[in-house]
Amino acid sequence: MPRLFRFILFAAIFCGAAGSARAQYPFGKNKVIYQGRNWRVLQTEHVDIYHYAPDSTLILYLAPLVEQTFQEYSETFHLDFKRRLPFVFYATHYDFQQTNILPSLISEYTGGFTDLMKGRIAVPANGSYANLRHVARHEMVHAFMLEKLHRVMDDRGKFTYGQPPLWFTEGMAEYLADSPQSPQGEMFVRDALLNSRLYHLDEIWRIEGSYMMYKQGEAILNYIGTNYGKDAVIRILENWWTASDFSLVLKNTIGVDMFELDDGFQKYARRRYYPSMLEHEFASDLGKQLTPDGSFYNRPTATIGPEGETDICAVTARDGRVVICSGPRTEEGGWHPDVLVTGGRSGRLESIPAFRSKIEAHGDTLIFVAKNNARDRLYLWSRSHHKEIASWRFDGLTMLQSPTLSGDGRRIVFSAIEARGRMDLFLLHLEDGKLERLTEDGYSEEDPDYNPHADVILFTSDRGAGEDLNRTHIYEMVLATREIVPVEGGPFADTNPDWSPDGKSFLFISDRDGTPDVYLHRPDGVVRQTNVTTGCSVPAFMPDGEHFLASVYERGEFHTYEFPIRNPAHSLRAPLPPDTLQVPWSRADVDPSSFVTKPYRTKFGIDFVGAGVAIDPSAGDIGNGGQMVLTDLLGNHQINIIFGTTTEDFSSVLKDFNAAVSYTNLSHHLNYSLAAFHLNSFTDRVFLSNQEKRTGGAFALSYPLSKFDRIEASTVFRQIEKINPATLAGLRQRESITGSVYLSAVRDNTLWTYGGPLLGWRFYVTGGPTVDFLGRGFDSSLLQFDVRRYVKLGPRVTLAMRYVTRNAWGGDDLVFYLGGPWTLRGYPYNEFLGRTTHLFNTELRFPLLDGLRIVLPFGPIELPMFRGALFFDAGRTSRNTFSVLDTDWLGTLGVGAELNLGYAPVIRVNFTWPTDLVTIKKDSGFELFIGYNY
């Protein structure tokens, strides 16, 4: 079983040094560790907090929080933890995205996670104490749930069991972490109910993993707690042993099965939300929707264009990437924007934040922030020339947010999260690039907005919130004196202030009436501007001062609306009295000496153990073996052990034993791997029998240049023995000692959809020599090149192109293969071989059916998606000797159909017509393929 085991071994030895690329070797994006950390462990009574935070403020807030939550949940879950709870804390979200606890890439929208294997909690700070508190409590619910299920099943001698459905686990975490449901959560559920998108429990898999699933799950758990008691949620876990079916566990606990629970919840939701809907209005009755259905637009801003027209810019999603678009209002009042800035294609503009940061447009200049490798960069962008005017990165400032330009165009104020995790305000002088700090305290300051006619800014802050960290208020700062004055206050959240063009009033968002709506603050009072059924966010004045833009959530989408300013005198409200600037909570009163702090020490634990049997039908070989993966708690140090056998029959399993062990260090920007291996009894198809024994070691380096690019180097030393007809006849040497050095470059900025890439491109090039130290003819050189391009031609229609060439020179008999569904389709698997191969693939992929529901006597089966393909392949192989085995150019025309099962491999059938590029065979071939499309 040559290729299978060699691939597994090579991936185990080298791919660990390639970050997230290990899942798609040799391609894949990179998880870059931009800076090594000096990790320490702070120990409370029950929790170990792993951190590196240079500022103790966040740790002194977090430590009592997690300890108090631990004790609270111990009572809630009726659970006595028998181990210390590991809690890994990251000072910023960008640091969190570099974690190696999970091998996969982490998006900007992941607030934290709890891993199933070791029960580790990983949480970042994002500048908000309220968010940190919520996420920490949310993830600790997961840890307690996992421990509770383990204890319940272990006490009854049951060691294999399933997990609750995701809507239940995430809903429980939201429900127990922060009750009652937030206005934003209510907004999502109310919109779903209004638009018939509140899924029944047997169909909630359609929104698996989405934010809507979290919020609907929370609403269901709130219904269970309200009708059956809060303790019923825990009793469901305590009765987990009673049945393997979740519906039966519900029946055994609260007396209703899943269908009865669903029926009760749907009625409960209608009774709860329908009356409130009568008190609200549809956004379309108040303003004009500017964006089409089925789209996402957020953070709108408006300015005067070069010809006096009104231009609108907004953040949107195009083809899976977050972009900034811009365009004028049409004479008919519509808006048809074009893409202005695209993120997600290079390290320079790695990603554009879709929610956390606003954009501003002033004439031809667009102001925004985007991630640039390790931290954010502030950009000035020309809208007319579609290019960068200027940009800045600041030492010590990791994440920038909501830049706002002064009226004279000489200064920019923005909020930023420092490397130590706190969010403050900063002032940039554009003439000389001088940066001034405006605030330095324990509070969070965000959403700044510059008065167009004065050196005054508005911003949102949690100062004065007391112990209710969900409260935020609007404050005003006079830049000349740095004096901070509260403007709006009360027991609710006020956010996103936006000055009017005359600088005398401002819009803001408030949930004071239970729904996030737009309000206008005037010198003489406050006027409510919207009263929509769902909710609004991020208002922005139009240049005329008589209208404003806002994002409205409806039908599960964010849309940009234009609303008229309302100024009715009878609707005037007095401004609510602002709170004093008291210190929230009592963070400064925590005694650091009450906790024990120790340096972090690397200790390995098992992450994965597996075994299996594999058969290579093309060679008739049998392989069986196992794998063990050990990592430290942070995932930075990994040991991978592989053992098994490749044999031609079961009688020689022990004789042909194989083993490899590798160590990978991922704790720094430069990753490295060490490996040792003993590989025995490979069989190849160059001769009737080709056995190889290889024993040696390897060393590999991987240096990511960005999320999308990396360079790699590796060296392998091995003792090799070949047993085949040529060596047995004395025509070639049998043994030698060789060394190889390879250099590689990889780029991958593709975006994936179900079954394969959607758009972007990727390439991989590697090459290097193998030296025979004993001069016995095993010298060789290798060069491989693989480039792939994906072009989106329409909605879910992709043109995929690939060119691969593999070349070997020298005395060794290394060859490459073509043929089969992975390479040259329409021909038997590995039909052609050579020391040089060329392969072209072109394929048009398109949707066939979005879903197929088959009703059977035992229940319905839903198959989510069918896709089709038209393809043409061409390939050629050649050898330096035995030229009779060379092939002319051969090709294949074909059609394919595949079943997509989410992110699982596709099940695909191909009908092929081989060709010599002159004639086409009349008889078609048939192929079955299970895997991912190239």
Task: Please tell me what each predicted stretch does.
Residues 328-331, 382-386, 429-433, 478-482, ...:
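Short loop/turn segments that connect beta-strands within beta-propeller blades
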Residues 167-168, 172-182, 190-259:
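Active-site-proximal alpha-helical
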Residues 621-683, 693-700, 711-717, 729, ...:
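C-terminal transmembrane beta-barrel domains of outer membrane proteins
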Residues 23-159, 163-165, 249:
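Juxtacatalytic substrate-recognition/specificity segment
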Residues 295-297, 315-325, 329-332, 344-354, ...:
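A flexible loop/linker signature enriched in serine peptidases of the S9 family
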Residues 567-647, 654-659, 706, 863:
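Interface/linker segment at the passenger-translocator junction
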Residues 30-33, 38-41, 208, 235-238, ...:
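Beta/coil-rich, acidic/histidine-enriched accessory regions frequently appended to metallopeptidases
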Residues 306-308, 361-363, 407-408, 452-453, ...:
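Residue-level detector of Asp-centered blade-edge/turn motifs that repeat once per structural unit
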